[in-house]
Amino acid sequence: MNPYKVFIVGHEGTTGLRIHERLSGRKDITLLSISDEDRKNIDVIASIAKDADIVFLCLPDAASKEVVAAIGDYPCKIIDTSTAFRTADDWAYGFPELGESYKNDIKTKQHIANPGCHASGMISCIAPLVKAGIAPVDYPFTITSLTGYSGGGKKMIGQYESEPKDYFLYAPRQYGLSQQHKHLPEVTHVCGLTEAPIFMPIVDDYYSGMEVSVGLHTRLLAKPVTVEDVHAALVDFYKDSTIVKVAPLNLEEDNKQLLNANKLSNTDGMVISVTGNNDRMVVHAIFDNLGKGASGAAVQCMNIALGLPEETGLSL
C-alpha cells in the first residue's frame, strides 16, 4: 500500500512542528513540503493540497478560513487546529471520546476541527457528567486551568526562555480576565450548556503540561451523588478509550500523590481524576497542552480519518 500523503500548512509553528515530529518517522506517511517563499501563497498551498490525503492547518483563524475556501472541493481531508470552525455544524469535532457519532463524523466528514487545549480539559470533565444526568446544563461551572508557557506559541516561549527574564514570569499569571476566552464557545456548544463557565486560565513557568480542574457543589447537581458515583460515571464514559484514562479514587495528599500539571508532558494521553468529598468535589484532567491538547489530538483524528488505529504514532 502506498503511503498516505500529508501536507502541514503552518509547519513552522508550535503545533505544526509537533505534528511534523510525530509523522516524520512513520513509514505509512509521506509529508508534502512547500518552500519558504510560497508558504503564504494561497494558490500554491491549494495546488499541493489537491494531491494530499490529509491537510493539517496550523494557522490563525483568518488564514485558516482563507485556505479552506481556496482548497474548496478537493478530496483531501482537512484538520484545522484554529478556533475558526469548532462550533460549525458541518465540521466534525475532533474529540472522538465523546461517542461513536463523533468518531463517525471524523471518519466520514471532509472537515475536522481540532479542539482547543483548555477546551479539551473542560469538555473531558463536563460532558460525561451532563450525559449521565449528574450535572444540569445550567450548572454554574467555575473552572481553573494551569498550563505551561508553550501554549502561548513562539512569542510567549521566547519571553519565558529569554535571558534575563522578566521578574513577573517566575510566578503563575492568570489571563483571560474578561471571561471572553476563545475556547468557551466550543465548551458551551459541545456540552450543550446554557451558560458559559467562569473560566480562570493560568500560565506558569514550565514548558508544557496542563491541569484543568472543574469544581462541583453536590447540592447544585441534578441528583444526589457521591464521589464514588461521579467517578463511576467517568469510568463508564471512558471505558473503551485507549487515550483517556480515569485514575483510581482515594488520592492522598502527600508528596507522591500531588496532582502535577506537567505529569503527562511529552505524551498524548489524558488522565481524569476525582478528588474531594460528598459535599464538594473536583474533577481534574491532566494532559499535555501540546499533546492531547493540540498535535497529539490532531494526529489521533488523522488516524481515525484514515481508518488506522487511533493511537498509531502517539506517545501514551
Model-derived features: where do they sit?
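N-terminal Rossmann-like NAD(P) cofactor-binding subdomain of oxidoreductases
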Residues: 1-175, 275-277
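Short glycine-rich loop/turn motifs that provide flexible caps or phosphate-binding loops at active sites
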Residues: 9-15, 115, 147, 208, ...
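A generic structural signal for alpha-helix starts
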Residues: 10, 120, 222-225, 289
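C-terminal substrate-binding/catalytic lobe of Rossmann-fold NAD(P)-dependent oxidoreductases
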Residues: 12-46, 137-140, 144-145, 149-283
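Predominant activation on well-ordered alpha-helical scaffold segments within soluble catalytic domains
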Residues: 20, 123-130, 184-188, 231, ...
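A glycine-rich, Thr/Ser-enriched phosphate-binding loop motif common to dinucleotide/cofactor-binding enzymes
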Residues: 113-124, 175-184, 290-299
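Active-site catalytic microenvironments for nucleophilic, acid-base chemistry
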Residues: 128-132, 217, 304-308
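C-terminal helical cap and adjacent loop that interface with cofactors, partners, or active-site loops
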Residues: 239, 261-316
